[in-house]
Amino acid sequence: CNHRDFMNYGVNGMRSTAVNSLLQTVARDPALDHPALVIFSLIGNDVCNGHPGTTHMTPPAVFKSKILEALATLDTKLPQGSYVLLVGLVDGRVLWDTMAERQHPLGPRYKDVYAYLNCNQVNPCHGFLNANASLRNETTRWARSLNEVYKQIVGNHSHKFSNFKMHFYDPDWQALIQKYVQAGGDAGDVIEPSDGFHPSQTGNELLSEALWNYLESNFTEAIGQPNEHNDAIMKTFGDQGGF
């Protein structure tokens, strides 16, 4: 019975060059457990760092090697019939476009907070949280080149893995924000106000909804069948608010 069988292996700042070591901790029994759905998302850490320029961004060839290595590890951990959804790196220009002229809770505008972080070499993403539009555009180009690697892996390497099928999902944050604004929301609500970098709880809700809609439309088999023990779970534990 898979009741609330959810595992979060998220580590802040995780990038492709280190993810394989993290996946060594995945705890599944390939012989006895039900198939799993793995949401494999590195967000933007392979292009985001505190260094000026692009020299510390992950090259596509290295990215490909490390992702294939990580997927090979997953193939030894997951029960047969599992699914892996590779989530694309974000176009982080939406951060500057949305937040730069807004006021940070501490008083200054976000663009000044970003500049302060850059000056002290502690900016979590020098490439996107930067007044230099050319650098922001180049960081997006680099992120897209890594997303192309994901697409190539799904298209050309799926046959190498016997225990799962793969899909690639590329979330469009600009579209998510526009939809939220059209419904009466404020674009700034989607970004975490304390750092002006990560998604807020609202942003996570929007992404979750979009991801679920993608699964329902494009990768239905990954959702699986309703738990056959749902009635017994309800009888034993009561109404848990939809969980």
At which residue positions do the language-model features occur?
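Serine-dependent acyl-ester chemistry module
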Residues: 46-61, 92-144
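Solvent-exposed, polar/charged alpha-helical surfaces in well-ordered, non-transmembrane soluble domains
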Residues: 21-24, 61, 65-72, 76, ...
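Conserved SGNH/GDSL esterase-like catalytic core that processes O-acyl groups on lipids
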Residues: 1-72, 233-238
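A compositional signature for long Ser/Thr(±Pro)-rich, low-complexity
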Residues: 1-12, 18-21, 103-124, 183-186, ...
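Loop/turn elements at helix/coil->beta-strand transitions in domains of secreted/extracellular proteins
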Residues: 2-5, 32-38, 78-84, 159-167
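Conserved catalytic region of serine esterases and O-acyltransferases that act on ester linkages
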Residues: 116-243
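Sec-exported extracytoplasmic/periplasmic mature domains
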Residues: 24-28, 43, 72-80, 151, ...
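Active-site-proximal beta-strand/loop segments in catalytic clefts of secreted hydrolases
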Residues: 9-14, 40-45, 87-91, 169-174, ...
